[in-house]
């Protein structure tokens, strides 16, 4: 069985409807020590929702944290996110610059 290092760095990907929401989420998760750092920026998103094609602007948020904090971070995002079904995707740091990881 694969052993998972709970201290492994991960980046959690989510989106927010606007800059203000992205900034609030970023500040709150860093303040709550659920993340070390967040980055966010605007993107154009094309998707299907409730049978209709949508073309919107939203903000991607990269949340840098550790594997052991993921479940608490996920709960926080679900509870406080303006979307009813936010994207919450964990991207493991399989390889990264060693000094940055620490």
Roles of regions detected by a PLM:
Residues 1-102:
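Positively charged, small/polar-rich N-terminal and surface patches that mediate targeting and assembly
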